[in-house]
Amino acid sequence: MAEEMEETHCMALNVENFKACAKIHNHVKNYLKKGLVQIVGFETEPVFQIMATACDGGILVFKVLNPFESFNVSYSRMETLSLSFKNQPHGNTYLYSKDLFGEAVKGASLTFLQRPGLCRPDFVRSDVLMDDDVTTSSHCTSLTSWSPPAHDIRAGTVMSKVVLSIKTCTMLQKWLKDQKSKGEPRCVRLCLNEILSVLVLSVGEASKTVHLKPVEGNPATSLLFADKQGDVCIISDDEAHDVSLDSLLAALGVCRIPALCLPCFNFHSNGVLEVVGLQFKSSKPASGELSVFLLRANPQVDFNGVPEGDVQTQEVSSVASTCRHLSESCSLDPPRTPELPGSPDTFKEIPGRSGSVHLERDLSCSDSEEETPKQKPAKAKPAAAPKRSEKRKREGGKKGPKAKSLKLTFNPLI
């Protein structure tokens, strides 16, 4: 079957540049496992990159600079390339990136094949030669039928740039993890203010402010290296983005590699927020680029909340909440019907020891103690609590005459 195929593209990889990017690959290999290997761009300057998802709202792009030593096109000549295949094929444990970024690799090549009579490649074959000049590996898989437009995401120009320090990055990662553990909304709002030079991150009612040091320059061509101390920025306009909390947390972890790079926020003119791994000045220049594109997330709407400034809505909601509270309290404690002092229901039967039944009046609410709504004052001040002895005398004086006037005794023996 392999003999019947026609070679369309054949490329020899620059092994040294792939080895130089091995540290970045090992840092993000868990994300790249389910990603796509892409060869895009012009045929004169092809780009090798691996694209994967960063949680639910981010796109991770790992690019290798100067990836090929030679690039030949036999059939299907096109002005632009768009070749994609899975890093881990279906039903297999083989990983292309593991072989291509290996430290013991001496030579590697990729060959794209097509069926006779067709004008597009259908399969890709990788050939890897190890340092011992004996061990070789070869693997063939089919191409994907579609190619995501990953090269079109960075279409806009960089309008603002924010470079974080090690201390600030650690603080933000810890704060986002705390908000995630609290079960807060999964949406984070990033607000960038030009006048105050601050970056505000808010999750629900919690917020965190990062004070930045503004510098002069063009955001697209300045701040090309990260600094371990201090948070610097170039802001041309105010920005506000709603992104996924998990994706932002993953982007900060992906773009922070010890002794190599720190996260940098790039705000593009087309509304795209990009987190880039910006390399240190003192570190050896790597032959790769690492970035995470954060997609816009719709903030969770609280339908029970009340927008600020809408007084009528606030009043209606307050009345509704009061009525709901009253209905709940009434369902738990049903209202009692008022009892008249002269009605037979106000007498209680108290069984006596000698077999007689005593009838006494309920004195819990007397006529003198009841007040009509007109008699109640507008605001009653709490009176001082009387002493225990005076309270007993007053209660004893009230109960004395009433108990004498209502002595009703019935002896069934007589």
Swiss-Prot record:
Q: Where is the composition biased (Basic residues)?
A: 389-405
Task: List all disulphide bridges recorded for this chain.
Answer: none
Q: Name one GO biological process term.
A: DNA replication
Q: Does the keyword S-adenosyl-L-methionine apply?
A: no
Output the Pfam families linked to this UniProt entry: Herpes_DNAp_acc
Instruction: Return the annotated region ranges for Disordered.
Output: 327-414
UniProt keywords (A-Z) are: DNA replication
Q: Which domain of life is it from?
A: Viruses
Role description: Increases the processivity of the viral polymerase, probably by acting as a sliding clamp that prevents dissociation of the polymerase from the active template.
Q: Which family does this protein fall into?
A: Belongs to the herpesviridae DNA polymerase accessory subunit family.
Name under which the protein is recorded = DNA polymerase processivity factor
Q: Which organism is it from?
A: Equine herpesvirus 2 (strain 86/87) (EHV-2)
